[in-house]
Amino acid sequence: MRQLWTQAAVIALTAGTLGAPAHASGQSGQRFTPNFPITQPAAPPPGETIQAQPGEAESLPRPTPIPVQSAPPIAQAELPPPAPVSTPAPAPQPVLRATPPRTVVTTTVTGPVVEVAGKPQVRVVESGDALDAIARGMGSTRAELVKLNDLEPPYRLKLGQKIKGPATTAKAYVVQTGDTMFAIAKRFNVTAAALAEENDLKSGAAIKKGQKLLLPDGYKDKGPIKTTQVIPGTPATMVAEAEPAPATTRPATPAATPSRPVRQPVSEETSEPATTSTTTLSVTGSVVTVAGPRQVHTVKSGDTLTAIARKFDMSVSELAEANKLDTEKPLKLGAKIKGPATTQKAYSVQTGDTLGEIAKRFNVSVKALAAENNLRATASLKKGQKIALPDGFRDKGPIRTTTTTRPATPPANTYARVDSSAAAASTPSSPVPYTPSGAAPRPSAPVAAQPITPPPSSGRTIIETAAAPTEAEIIASGKGKFAWPLRGDIISSFGVKGTGQRNDGLNIRAPQGTPVLSSADGEIAYAGNQVPTFGNLVLVKHADGWVTAYAHLSSTNVKMRQQVKQGEQLGTVGATGGVNEPQLHFEMRYAPTVKDKAKPVDPALVLPR
């Protein structure tokens, strides 16, 4: 029982203690809520009453009030700002760059032309020649020729005797560093062979700076050679920047999803590829002075030997000797008195020249040129042969043929990387979670910049092949391998001949039955007459992709698969296939590979001159 009273006293004491702060602070009606749990004692069972003993409660000490102060509010501590995050400098990003085309001009063969002592003049005595006439032709005098040749009176000349004249002056070119015989010949509009022959050299002979090269007769100085080359620019390609951007320091932010380069078409002007112009010269021989036909006087009534000698500017003795006449006897009416030989201009033939081409250079007809030289219009010519030029000729200079080739234009890169600022502008402002593809895992590190490759086309597969050879390269590859199948007048040259018409070869006029020879070693690929308009036709397949064709033959001497050598007869000239006169249609074709279609090539640019 005592224990129960003790518990009741503790409860009352506790209640008084909890109520004291409210009265002490002067705030009634507001209770302080403890911040610890309170466990209430179990309630006494119903019906049981606990009564305190008299005097026991009074004997307990009265509790003293405890002063309570309100705790100050707890200040919320401010967190320090996050430490700045140093972002490393990004890897060099690819940028779109292109090089514009540029023009390069180089000047060569810049040496001066000087005057030097030329070779002495030489005249071979022919029938009817007189010393005085030879002296006049050389621009000299009888006395000078007598001294130069140690002649003695009465100064009789013998057939075939060589009479030396005074030395002439000539023009020469002073060689500069890097000059070649071919480049010098090009400047002075002559052939390298003619230039070498004039200087007793070989065409490919080495020359030194300061060396003087005599210039052949008929040269034309076109001045230093200027070569202009357009170097094409490079198409726009992705390249890494030369210097990476400096590192930046910024507050840490949520990592953004790495962006990828976006391929977009770029409208880009394609640079013009370099063009190559090949100029070839033909009929490049020199014009020389040769002995012309002798003057002839027909004796008329009253003529005397003295009067005729005066007309020919000869002495009576020279005229009598040249015609085997007796000065004491009278002349017969109608007799032909031969005077001194005249001089005239002639063209010195070079390899590959024809009467037709020579006539074109000197602005005369083939018929007149052939008649002046007692030749047929289709006659073959030899190097060094002198072709007399008819009266009224006009020298237009060597024939120039210019061929312009343009290499294939490389495909331009039409894809470029979109600028990062533009890509950022289209990025949503709210974060978008990145969902990696199952096929390609998300990269965990920056990806190195790679060149952007255009996506494959949906059309046919494109197979990359080596660039096709240019026309100049094709011509160079055939030089020195082929020979003319025959010689004659070219009546139709290579190229376009009118609206819708084109000649893929050369038509060479020649007499019926003239042998047609193989241009080079090879195998007979075709021999027959089944190709319309070509008549009897022979095709020869050669090494390195070359094929030659020989059409309008009157007969053929070969069969399929037969091996032939250069110069071996294939057939004879005819007029089969619808042509109206005997001729040979000759073609040269080239194919880089067996899969390529053979392309016609101008034989005049490949065959020797």
Swiss-Prot record:
Pfam families in the record: LysM (PF01476), Peptidase_M23 (PF01551)
Against InterPro entries, the record matches this protein to: Cell_wall_metabolism_enzyme, Dup_hybrid_motif, LysM_dom, LysM_dom_sf, Peptidase_M23
**SMART domains per record:** LysM
Keyword Transcription regulation listed = no
Listed under GO cellular component are: periplasmic space
Q: Where is the LysM domain?
A: 121-165, 171-215, 295-339, 345-389
Q: Present the record's domain note.
A: Composed of four peptidoglycan binding (LysM) domains and a C-terminal lysostaphin-like (LytM) peptidase domain. The LysM domains are the major mediators of the localization to the division site, probably via direct interaction with peptidoglycans. The LytM region is dispensable for localization, but is essential for function.
Protein name (Swiss-Prot/TrEMBL): Cell division protein DipM
- Name of the gene encoding the protein in the UniProt record: dipM
